[in-house]
């Protein structure tokens, strides 16, 4: 980015998102949807391997208003209207092995340590990641930044949105994650799920 004003604004946004008050990896997290029994996640690569694991237990970060979370606020959790079950997920950050994705380098390094070749690109090998980590957390900063540089991806003048561009580089961006969230690949010690009252709409 050549414009000094754009660079200055970008640096200010990144600094704000790195502030301790913006930390999104907090306990408790929120899980929406019925939980009948907590079992060990069976993490697999999807039929079309990519940025998302299959079989993970997903949680979202609660928001300051106390009634919503990052999944609900993003509009991605369409089940919440018909399945109001909501749980708080308590964990010990000092015990759980959680890799944080705050930057493009964080995401690229995770893939480089656990690569799976798919159609000429390296994508995350989720069973391999699950052997090393209990969870992967995507922060707000990571949601914005964990994508391959535009210079690494062939230009497609027919694509206006940039999504396909993000997915066609030497490694995929995190666009499929959609929002700030945590993918639990294993259940660590000191992990507890408690039912909470449904969110009032």
Name each model-derived stretch.
Residues 38-82, 88:
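Extended catalytic/binding region for NAD+/ADP-ribose chemistry, centered on the ART fold
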Residues 1-39, 76-201:
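Active-site and NAD+-binding cores of ADP-ribose-processing enzymes
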């Amino acid at each position: 980015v050549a414009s000094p004003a754009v660079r200055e604004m970008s640096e200010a946004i990144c600094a704000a998102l790195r502030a301790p008050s913006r930390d999104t990896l907090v306990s408790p997290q929120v899980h929406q949807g019925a939980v009948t029994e907590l079992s060990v996640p069976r993490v697999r690569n999807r039929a079309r391997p990519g940025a998302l694991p299959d079989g993970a237990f997903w949680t979202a970060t609660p928001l300051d208003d106390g009634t919503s979370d990052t999944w609900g606020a993003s509009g991605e959790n369409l089940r919440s209207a018909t399945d109001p079950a909501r749980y708080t997920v308590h964990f010990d950050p000092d015990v759980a092995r959680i890799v944080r994705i705050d930057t493009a380098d964080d995401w690229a390094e995770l893939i480089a340590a656990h690569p799976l070749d798919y159609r000429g690109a390296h994508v995350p090998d989720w069973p391999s990641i699950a052997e090393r980590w209990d969870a992967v957390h995507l922060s707000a900063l990571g949601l914005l930044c964990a994508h391959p540089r535009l210079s690494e991806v062939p230009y497609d003048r027919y694509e206006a949105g940039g999504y396909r561009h993000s997915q066609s580089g030497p490694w995929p961006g995190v666009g499929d994650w959609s929002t700030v969230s945590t993918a639990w690949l294993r259940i660590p010690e000191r992990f507890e799920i408690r039912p909470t009252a449904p969110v009032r709409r």
